[in-house]
Amino acid sequence: MANMRVKFPTLVLLLGIVFLMAVSIGIAYGEKNAIKNHERPQEREQEERDPRQQPRPRHQEEQEREHGREEERNREPSRGRSESEESREEEREQRREPSRGREQEQQPQHGRREEEEEWQPRRQRPQSRREEREQEQGSSSSSGRQSGYERREQREEREQQQEQDSRSESRRQRNPYYFSYERFQTLYKNRNGQIRVLERFDQRTNRLENLQNYRIVEFQSKPNTLILPKHSDADYILVVLNGRATITIVNPDKRQAYNLEHGDALRLPAGTTSYILNPDDNQNLRVVKLAIPINNPGNFYDFYPSSTKDQQSYFNGFSRNTLEATFNTRYEEIQRIILGNEDGQEDEEQSRGQEQSHQDQGVIVRVSKEQIQELRKHAQSSSGKGKPSESGPFNLRSDEPIYSNKFGNFYEITPDRNPQAQDLDISLTFIEINEGGLLLPHYNSKAIFVVVVDEGEGNYELVGIRDQERQQDEQEQEEVRRYNAKLSEGDIFVIPAGHPISINASSNLRLLGFGINADENQRNFLAGSEDNVIRQLDKEVKQLTFPGSVEDVERLIKNQQQSYFANAQPQQQQQREKEGRRGRRGLSFPFRSLFTKLLSTIM
């Protein structure tokens, strides 16, 4: 009992202490709310003004409340603390900073930039009375911080841009012979169509220096549209890849119009004024042109007689006196009829009740049905079968393909058969590879081919040799390098002379090729039953060249019975066929026995 008497007062004392602690916690919680709601209005207003800030986690709010309570104690009359106490307080605050940084790193990466902007001002809050006084100096310091934020954002944008440039540079280094659809630059664009040009070939690598004077131009237009007359300081070889077109070529003494369809090609000499019409009511027009500049290697310019929002008329370049003497009339009349008003708008009385003028539309304009009929009235069609003419259009598939089997077709018009491209030393090829087909490995003896993906998807593998400088530094690595890429419509790739290449189609693939330096070019296949240079080697040379025996080499070479085109996955197809036959045999017996048992039960 004595022990019970001793323990009972102790128990009462402990309960009293617990009660006092609970009351203290409640008071402290109320103080924290008061600090949050009353002592930090500036921070709350800043948060309301900045919509980018996200809701803060609870552990950050508790740390901020603790920091606010410490600041409140600093503002109380008992601020006459010693410098040692302030230094200890600053040390404790500095020790909290690494933990805050770790907690910030543990948060999700989504919205990282907004979180950094939310986190940064907290690290800049005054942590001593000296910093508090500096903060109270006025708006000059806040404007300085704002400029610091802007500089930080600009620096981040520059770093992101540099990272993107480095990634694109690395892609170019991986395969400098491949140009995706996005590598085109837009020259003109409006709601009726666009004109784009591919970046220069020699900007990718010095291995394509011989292509510095060749550019690829693409023209697309919607139905019932016309590209306004112009001439250029470049020779063109244009090919229609989609839709129909009517092109009119204007010379000093005559005008000639031609109707073009898919696969039709035409030589357009430099300085020739021309305009292209899309007469179709439903189908878009797509034309690809190989440009060979005359004045400046790699650069060419289009000259328009009309003024639009995209460009000025070349008549604008002449002086007033020259124009008046040229047209033998007043300048105001010339400006009204040819140049248009200086502000690029028609008079209000002229524009009222009329359709949108061609000056507002740009270089690609809409045309009416009546205008289309007049433009096509005297147009001629392509030459069809046979050798291309000296002036008119010709079709790339007019003759029989030079290579053909069930997996694909290969059409080619060489310079000696094409009077229009003979002086340019350019050949034209059109390749059709059926789905699952493979254009067998081969190389060109002297021609450089620029290939445009007309339709379909696939991939190609190009074999090259490392640079001699790299070979000296990396002698332990192989010299041969494979360049490969996935192909889709609009992509472009280059096949240098002497570089073996193979192309396979994951869907029906159509390719247009421009052969540069194509005169007397020879195509050498490395596999297949025909035109196989490996097959023509002497047996003694085969024995010295390959590690296998002569018999094994001969058997391997003769194993491919197709020529030019073949099945891209013959082994997989054979395996699937075997599994299919095995599956049919395995399923036939159970079904037959089950059917027999069912009949016996019925009988």
Swiss-Prot record:
Domain Cupin type-1 stretches: 177-335, 394-554
Region: Disordered, residue numbers: 36-177, 343-363, 375-399, 564-583
UniProt cross-references to InterPro entries, sorted A to Z: Cupin_1, RmlC-like_jellyroll, RmlC_Cupin_sf, Seed_Storage-Functional
GO molecular function: nutrient reservoir activity
Alphabetically ordered keywords of this record: Allergen, Glycoprotein, Seed storage protein, Signal, Storage protein
SUPFAM superfamilies assigned to the protein according to its UniProt record, in alphabetical order: RmlC-like cupins (SSF51182)
Residue stretches of biased makeup (Basic and acidic residues): 36-105, 148-172
Signal peptide bounds: 1-30
Glycan attachment points: 504
Transmembrane segments: none
Low complexity bias locations: 137-147, 381-393, 564-574
Pfam families referenced in this protein's UniProt entry, alphabetically: Cupin_1
Additional information: The variability of the residues taking part of IgE-binding epitopes might be responsible of the difference in cross-reactivity among legumes.
Family stated for the protein in its record: Belongs to the 7S seed storage protein family.
Summary of subunit composition and partner proteins: Component of globulins complexes which accumulate in seeds.
Function: Seed storage protein. Accumulates during seed development and is hydrolyzed after germination to provide a carbon and nitrogen source for the developing seedling.
Protein name: Conglutin beta 2
